[in-house]
């Protein structure tokens, strides 16, 4: 989820345009920034770790005239945040400079090949591999060279490339990563999103997957995946900057909810091989699962609820004792830890202090530690024995949505990986579990298309003051996350309970005007959930069902969020997306600040 900008124009103000554009995409989150521009002496790169201000201060006394350049803000995925790992990247001969958003899956094998040919690398990134490969394959023509490069690499990407032999142009391409072209008067632009170039143009071409585009100040030439020159539609953008920074969405939260299909696909593509086997050998090097007899999953808030889903997966698939604990309590619960214990610590930011302290405690007791985090180079990833990164990209809204689903999906894949290592999962079942991930993505897309139905429900419940979220089995874990979302951004008191536990006290609180969200994705327990619904309906509750097709729940509730079957283990994840929408639209109707709810912080760094 990096920020990209490129410029080719008749005015020698490329550096100014690039720095201004990068400032406009700071909202996406980043850990370093850099630009490359063409001068009379060749290509010059300037880049700095940290905030864009560091780069600006570094360059404040520079006097540079340049008509072509590219700029980038980086969110690290390969190589920790440092000056040398920041983009852009040179080839060894400095004839090529390149920026990249995405992940190159087979970079290691290409890097090995280039090293054997004597190429010297100056960073730890997958991106530099592409710059070096482009230089090696260069045949004097930018387009034909790029096509040769693209045939060698696998992954998701948006590239912008400049070459010293063609000082007036950029060549760019995209594959499952956003890239647009902005059209101006004797100046043209490329960017990852509209906000970077809105000051200069509102005429935008949205490139499609497989497109390659050559950009000069006066010409834009687009080739499609079949290498045919095509004319893409030019669209007039009517957004203002604030809207553009959110990609046209009203809030970051709904934008991030709707990025989940892309994240599901990316996670599947990056963490499975061509045969769709989970490939965590590198991430889990040194961990012998035959020696593990107990697993702990430790986290806070939404990450903890993702951990509950992970616990369910592992207990069902592995037959190993798996425990979850809240990080602030873990050290004080006297967990039984030996050198046969695997302790998994989940933190979006990688800086959650309770989780860090719990990991320190587990290491001291002899546990093998695994971090699951969204931020490369964060404290938790440096201190754990092993790390698996979620691929959610920066999450701006305080209420977590896409980070949750990416954490759950990583733990799902981890369960399959361990199960395969231990011989616990039959091949036909393994392939079904993997194929369910693609099914989940398709069904999230379908749910997004039906979101206005959930908006209509939100209009009816917006004035409710108290509520309960109920579920059985894995759905009780769904209830917890759904309840948290409603609390976080609506300030409605809600409580999540196992549905069968309601009658043991809490049913005394059910009366007219109380909201009950009843969740049922396991049809074996559907009739029991229906019975619980009838109990609360008889006492005046307004009941919203959240269930999969085939459930009896729609027959007995006031409103329903119905989702398609995405497999036994992943349908609950789809249901959570529906509950994210319910919380979002309720907050929208109440007029609250969806992205910045009161009293909450994105990263909790104090105990």
What are these regions (language model features)?
Residues 260-264, 268-296, 386-515, 588-607:
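Active-site phosphate/pyrophosphate-binding segments
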Residues 71-84, 274-287, 310-346, 493-509:
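Glycine-rich oxoanion-binding loops at beta->alpha junctions
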Residues 227, 542, 556, 566-607:
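Generic C-terminus detector
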Residues 287-439, 519-559, 564, 582, ...:
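Glycine-rich phosphate-binding loops that contact phosphosugars or nucleotide phosphates
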Residues 1-246, 250, 262-293, 305, ...:
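Conserved short alpha-helical segments that host acidic/polar catalytic motifs at enzyme active sites
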Residues 8-11, 100, 120, 136-139, ...:
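Hydrophobic alpha-helical scaffolding
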Residues 68, 96, 294-296, 342, ...:
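Structural motif
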């Amino acid at each position: 989820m990096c920020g990209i900008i490129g410029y080719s124009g008749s005015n020698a103000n490329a550096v100014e345009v690039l720095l201004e554009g990068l400032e406009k995409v700071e909202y996406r989150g980043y850990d370093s920034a850099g630009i490359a521009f063409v001068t009379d002496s060749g290509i010059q790169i300037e880049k700095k770790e940290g905030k864009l201000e560091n780069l600006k201060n570094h360059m404040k006394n520079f006097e540079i005239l340049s008509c072509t350049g590219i700029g980038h803000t980086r969110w690290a995925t390969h190589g920790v945040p440092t000056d040398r790992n920041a983009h852009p990247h040179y080839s060894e001969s400095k004839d090529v400079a390149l920026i990249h958003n995405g992940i190159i899956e087979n970079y290691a094998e290409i890097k090995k090949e280039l090293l054997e040919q004597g190429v010297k690398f100056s960073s730890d990134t997958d991106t530099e591999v592409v710059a070096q490969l482009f230089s090696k394959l260069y045949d004097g023509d930018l387009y034909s060279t790029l096509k040769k490069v693209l045939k060698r690499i696998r992954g998701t990407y948006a590239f912008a490339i400049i070459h010293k032999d063609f000082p007036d142009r950029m060549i760019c391409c995209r594959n499952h990563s956003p890239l647009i072209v902005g059209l101006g008067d004797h100046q043209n632009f490329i960017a990852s999103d509209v906000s970077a170039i809105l000051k200069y143009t509102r005429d935008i071409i949205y490139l499609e997957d497989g497109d390659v585009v050559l950009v000069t100040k006066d010409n834009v030439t687009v080739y499609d995946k079949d290498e045919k020159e095509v004319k893409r539609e030019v669209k007039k953008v009517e957004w203002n900057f604030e809207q553009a920074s959110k990609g046209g969405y009203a809030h970051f939260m709904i934008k991030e909810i709707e990025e989940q299909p892309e994240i599901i696909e990316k996670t599947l593509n990056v963490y499975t091989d061509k045969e769709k086997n989970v490939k965590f050998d590198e991430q889990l090097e040194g961990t012998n699962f035959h020696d593990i007899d107990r697993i702990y999953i430790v986290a806070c808030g939404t990450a903890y609820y993702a951990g509950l889903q992970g616990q369910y997966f592992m207990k069902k698939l592995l037959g190993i004792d798996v425990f979850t604990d809240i990080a602030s309590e873990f050290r004080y619960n006297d967990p039984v830890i030996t050198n046969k214990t695997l302790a998994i610590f989940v933190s979006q930011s990688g800086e959650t202090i309770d989780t860090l302290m719990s990991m320190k405690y587990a290491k001291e007791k002899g546990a093998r530690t695994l971090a699951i985090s969204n931020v490369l180079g964060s404290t938790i990833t440096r201190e754990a024995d092993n790390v698996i990164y979620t691929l959610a990209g920066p999450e701006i809204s305080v209420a977590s949505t896409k980070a949750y689903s990416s954490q759950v999906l990583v733990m799902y894949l981890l369960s399959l990986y361990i199960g395969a290592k231990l011989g616990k999962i039959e091949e036909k079942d393994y392939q079904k579990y993997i194929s369910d991930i693609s099914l989940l993505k398709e069904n999230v897309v379908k749910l997004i298309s039906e979101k206005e139905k959930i908006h209509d429900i939100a209009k009816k419940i917006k004035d409710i003051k108290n509520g309960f979220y109920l579920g059985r089995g894995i759905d009780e874990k769904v209830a917890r996350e759904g309840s948290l979302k409603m609390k976080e951004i609506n300030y409605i008191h809600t409580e999540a309970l196992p549905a069968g536990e309601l009658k043991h006290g809490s049913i005394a609180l059910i009366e007219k005007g109380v909201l009950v969200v009843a969740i049922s994705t396991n049809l074996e327990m559907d009739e029991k959930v229906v019975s619980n619904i009838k109990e609360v309906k008889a006492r005046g509750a307004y009941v919203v069902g959240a269930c999969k097709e085939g459930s009896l729940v729609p027959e007995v509730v006031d409103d329903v969020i119905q989702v398609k079957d995405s497999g036994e283990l992943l349908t609950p994840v789809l249901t959570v997306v529906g509950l994210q929408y319910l919380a979002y639209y309720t907050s929208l109707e109440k007029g609250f600040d969806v992205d910045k709810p009161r009293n909450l912080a994105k990263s909790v760094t104090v105990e």
